[in-house]
């Protein structure tokens, strides 16, 4: 297969416009994320702005069309001729003629069928997956009301997965392409939030955010996935991934008590949402976070245990610490120091 990942990436991203104004007018009642919903009405935290999505370009007749234009004189005859070529296994030639039909007679009744046949032939007969994706995209961009939207979007998504997996095998290219591929999946979710693949796509987006090292955005994506598709298997997988991403942020950033407490709260909730091996994993993360909070609380208590502070302040600080962490790692040390301070105060 030809290596044309950049056109593929641009192609997926452009899919975002597959339900522009004509389609949206027809489907204005379809909102939310239920089955059949074609476009998102809410913000998607962790996604990039739609401003960065490439606008589609309409096909135009080629120069010197008398040489490389359609062979037949009308769209109906041209489509029949293309099907004959495919039946004769002249698929490459058929693709050129199908493309010529769409360019020459874009408003004809045969144009949507020709565009679909072009995409299918590239994918199923020639294995040209990147080109096929671009043609499915074009079908959705310009013939969204004349095609089976859900079926075509599903085919485009399957091709996106194939191309993403192939990109993984090219190590020196994979990481350069991560951002563009993520934006491609985002555009699919934004324009087809009710599709069967939407939750799976969001899980992929979260993983790609992690690949970029954008763990805070990954957390947002996973959290939104759980909220939008709570009963999906991807929502269950997102719990552990969100926990791991939150921990990366916690470990890499300067200590922040609010962030730490928020993470501890999430991990407590996560225990009720997971099962199997994930339970033990979440518990180990929870213990790590609680250890961070305890260490911070102990540092705060020791802050009051100095010559510039009164013994009463230090005693109160250690008592507060022990009331919160009676069995903590620093509890014994805090008790010993508390007894010393109380003994000194009675002298």
Per-region residue spans from a language model:
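Bacterial N-terminal signal peptides
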Residues: 9-19
